[in-house]
């Protein structure tokens, strides 16, 4: 009887590992935050360059940032979201703009 229980435990462990491996990754929202100094054209440029939006959609999102204080640029896995946030913030600083990009769990 001991062997049967060992196999059941092993099977249960294997099923749990497979279930854990198949879980979808955690997703994160990448958010642009409004400020009073970054030009609207620069925000549109950021949305096109880093999020691949066309000029029309980038303009809509820029206006959402401007009037609502922030807007979600996209939802990504943690690694992608962290990379996009870092790249946008670096690009903004290199161009001497205070634009802030953040992330939060979706």
Swiss-Prot record:
One of its GO terms (biological process) is proteolysis. It comes from the Bacteria. It holds the Pfam family ClpS. Gene3D superfamilies: 3.30.1390.10. InterPro entries: ClpS, ClpS_core, Ribosomal_bL12_C/ClpS-like. One of its GO terms (molecular function) is protein-folding chaperone binding. Belongs to the ClpS family. Binds to the N-terminal domain of the chaperone ClpA. Involved in the modulation of the specificity of the ClpAP-mediated ATP-dependent protein degradation. This is ATP-dependent Clp protease adapter protein ClpS. It comes from Escherichia coli (strain K12). The gene is clpS.
